[in-house]
């Protein structure tokens, strides 16, 4: 592998930090607000890289991928990375529209370069388009099944390319750097990011109409007045206090075994009504009197037994029992 010149070293010093920012965006380790200063710095660095690449004439329009030196292959990713950085730059809706347009231009330029180098052979959708409006209005609508199939195929291809990239990197770490393996790694990365750009361009096309509508409403608020809030009449609930057993039973129910079904008064009125004549009459007064006399006799016997027990305790003190062999 040939040694790097001073110009290539300065290129690499600007390119590598920007590539690190792209890796952090892909990994999702940092939040988007934390990455904003680094994204802006990465855009500035890659713009300088673009100027240096043009001054050094690393690429020409009449060559194929086999003619590009191995050391120059990574810089084919510069427009792709610029598109990713502009896409992730946080701005107001009006400025975001411009950032997405720049991102779209960079990503298309990246795919155009790969097609000119014959690295990809598929026909690009925008080759026959003249303006962005024509792209948004006259773009043929694909069926849902077709969109799903294309997404699955692209995702599968990305996974295969990512696995191939990891495999080549392990080979480069295990042995000394071989130019053939290094070139294969760069080609694999270019193919991976080409699939990624297809996905991001579709996402940008879906987002642009929404941002245009938001920007138009922000610039002409009187044309799009905000709809009045929907007023829904809600019936007012009157406060109430449970003061009677009937209301309490309506709330708590009657089936819980620990709560009585009715009060004594309710049971009495339900059973006998308000007529005292319906109350149960004693059918055997004589029996009641006999029971009372028996209770009195029992009380007299119990009283006499208690008196006899007291007299016994007076005559027989505690511990006076059998004193045999007690000294």
UniProtKB/Swiss-Prot annotation:
Main function? Probable regulatory subunit of serine/threonine-protein phosphatase PP4 which may play a role in meiosis and embryonic mitosis. Probably in association with catalytic subunit pph-4.1, regulates microtubule severing during oocyte meiosis II by dephosphorylating and likely activating mei-1, a component of the katanin microtubule severing complex.
One GO term (biological process): meiotic cell cycle
UniProt protein name? Serine/threonine-protein phosphatase 4 regulatory subunit ppfr-4
Bias class Polar residues marks the residues at: 275-284
The entry summarizes the disruption phenotype as follows: RNAi-mediated knockdown causes 94 percent embryonic lethality when injected compared to 20 percent when fed. Partially rescues embryonic lethality in gain of function mei-1 (ct46) mutant background.
Q: Does the keyword Oxidoreductase apply?
A: no
Q: Where is this region: Disordered?
A: 271-327
Coiled-coil regions listed in the entry: 141-185
- Give an example GO molecular function: protein phosphatase regulator activity
Q: Which UniProt keywords apply?
A: Coiled coil, Meiosis
Return the PANTHER family for the record: IMMUNOGLOBULIN-BINDING PROTEIN 1
> Which gene produces this protein?
ppfr-4
Q: How does it assemble?
A: Serine/threonine-protein phosphatase 4 (PP4) occurs in different assemblies of the catalytic and one or more regulatory subunits. The catalytic subunit is likely to be pph-4.1.
Q: What is a single cellular component term in the Gene Ontology annotation?
A: cytosol
Q: Where is there biased composition of kind Acidic residues?
A: 291-301
Instruction: List, as start-end ranges, the regions of compositional bias called Basic and acidic residues.
Output: 302-318
């Amino acid at each position: 592998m040939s040694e790097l010149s001073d110009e290539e070293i300065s290129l690499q010093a600007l390119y590598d930090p920007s590539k690190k920012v792209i890796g952090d965006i892909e990994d999702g380790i940092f939040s988007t607000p934390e990455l904003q200063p680094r994204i802006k710095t990465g855009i500035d660095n890659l713009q300088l890289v673009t100027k240096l690449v043009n001054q050094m004439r690393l690429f020409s329009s009449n060559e194929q991928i086999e003619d590009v030196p191995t050391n120059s292959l990574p810089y084919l990713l510069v427009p792709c990375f610029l598109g990713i950085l502009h896409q992730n730059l946080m701005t107001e809706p009006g400025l975001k529209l411009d950032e997405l347009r720049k991102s779209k231009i960079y990503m298309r330029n990246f795919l155009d370069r790969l097609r000119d180098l014959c690295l990809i052979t598929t026909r690009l959708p925008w080759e026959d388009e003249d303006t962005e409006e024509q792209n948004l209005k006259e773009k043929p609508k694909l069926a849902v099944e077709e969109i799903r199939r294309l997404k699955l195929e692209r995702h599968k291809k990305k996974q295969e390319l990512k696995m191939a990239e990891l495999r080549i990197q392990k080979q480069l770490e295990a042995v000394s750097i071989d130019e053939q393996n290094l070139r294969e790694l760069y080609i694999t990365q270019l193919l991976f990011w080409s699939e990624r750009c297809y996905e991001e361009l579709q996402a940008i096309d879906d987002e642009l109409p929404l941002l245009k509508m938001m920007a138009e409403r922000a610039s002409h608020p009187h044309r799009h007045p905000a709809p009045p809030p929907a007023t829904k009449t809600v019936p007012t609930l009157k406060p109430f206090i449970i003061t009677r057993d009937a209301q309490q039973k309506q709330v708590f129910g009657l089936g819980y075994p620990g709560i009585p079904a009715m009060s004594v008064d309710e049971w009495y009125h339900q059973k006998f009504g308000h007529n005292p004549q319906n109350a149960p009459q004693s059918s055997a007064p004589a029996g009641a009197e006999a029971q009372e006399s028996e209770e009195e006799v029992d009380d007299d016997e119990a009283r006499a037994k208690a008196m006899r027990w007291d007299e016994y305790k007076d005559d027989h003190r505690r511990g006076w029992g059998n004193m045999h062999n007690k000294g």
